[in-house]
């Protein structure tokens, strides 16, 4: 798999921003078919950092209503990536 198809986007919420500061962890939305080894290699090669651990969560899509019809949002995978001490990734760097 291509590293750009494995890593889709950063997942930025209030909870993940607290984890970034406290535990040196970044959170990414990744491809559902990717595994921890592929995610680790993609992050290390793309951001030039050392990855200590990768934890993944499969998130089920919510059922939403569109007028009278019901639909379902897509399932997705989230990865919590712990970086080596002293290393950071700044997603909003200009």
Curated annotation (Swiss-Prot):
Annotated function: One of the early assembly proteins it binds 23S rRNA. One of the proteins that surrounds the polypeptide exit tunnel on the outside of the ribosome. Forms the main docking site for trigger factor binding to the ribosome.
PANTHER family: 60S RIBOSOMAL PROTEIN L23A
NCBIfam families the record matches: PRK05738.1-3, PRK05738.2-4, PRK05738.3-2
Single Gene Ontology MF annotation: rRNA binding
Keywords: Ribonucleoprotein, Ribosomal protein, RNA-binding, rRNA-binding
Family that this chain belongs to: Belongs to the universal ribosomal protein uL23 family.
Organism (species): Trichlorobacter lovleyi (strain ATCC BAA-1151 / DSM 17278 / SZ) (Geobacter lovleyi)
PROSITE patterns: RIBOSOMAL_L23
Record has Ribosomal protein as a keyword: yes
GO cellular component, one term: ribonucleoprotein complex
Name of the molecule in the record: Large ribosomal subunit protein uL23
Any one Gene Ontology BP term: translation
Lineage, highest ranks first: Bacteria, Pseudomonadati, Thermodesulfobacteriota, Desulfuromonadia, Geobacterales
Top-level division of the source organism's lineage: Bacteria
UniProt cross-references to Pfam families, sorted A to Z: Ribosomal_L23
Assembly description: Part of the 50S ribosomal subunit. Contacts protein L29, and trigger factor when it is bound to the ribosome.
